[in-house]
């Protein structure tokens, strides 16, 4: 929290905060008592770290003369409702920052929510895109809902592609596919 304590409950939606309010949060370590924290017990704590803007990340890399490739994952979901901006606004802002920094040729934009990937490819075909999928008991972006489609796949109908996930990825226009599965 801005006062230096772990959030005891879900915090405010990020989109409701000003940049100054967002930067008040110390994000330099994960709470080790949470399930997420227990997944990463070796995480190096960096107390006092603030959330950088995308432009600040690009500037940080540029200041070091680096030619790092950027693998940017959009953290937006089809189940977020109005707690996040709409996918088109999200992608337009991200693409504008990528282009302003002159790093489109070394950026991959990836997401489990293919809406952002499809929009990115339409708006900025020069940016490499990656469709992500997950098939886990507690997180499945492949399993269809009652409509026969997964809300994660930008409205794509698997039946129109032989119920083949690789064909669905290709039809979405993704340059890459990263599949995650397990138990």
Where are these predicted regions, by residue range?
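Metal-dependent phosphodiesterase/phospholipase catalytic core, i.e.
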Residues: 1-118, 122-137, 146-182
């Amino acid at each position: 929290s801005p006062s230096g304590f772990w959030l005891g409950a879900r915090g405010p939606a990020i989109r409701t905060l000003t940049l100054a309010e967002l930067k008040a949060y110390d994000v330099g370590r994960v709470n080790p008592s949470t399930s997420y924290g227990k997944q990463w017990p070796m995480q190096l704590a960096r107390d006092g770290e603030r959330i950088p803007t995308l432009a600040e990340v690009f500037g940080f890399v540029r200041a070091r003369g680096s030619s790092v490739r950027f693998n940017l994952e959009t953290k937006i979901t089809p189940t977020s409702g109005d707690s996040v901006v709409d996918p088109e606004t999200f992608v337009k802002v991200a693409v504008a920052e990528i282009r302003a920094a002159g790093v489109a040729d070394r950026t991959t934009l990836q997401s489990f929510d293919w809406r952002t990937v499809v929009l990115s490819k339409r708006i900025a075909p020069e940016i490499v895109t990656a469709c992500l999928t997950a098939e886990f008991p507690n997180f499945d972006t492949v399993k269809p809902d009652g409509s026969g489609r997964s809300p994660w796949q930008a409205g794509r109908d698997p039946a129109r592609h032989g119920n083949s996930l690789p064909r669905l990825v290709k039809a979405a226009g993704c340059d890459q596919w990263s599949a995650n599965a397990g138990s």
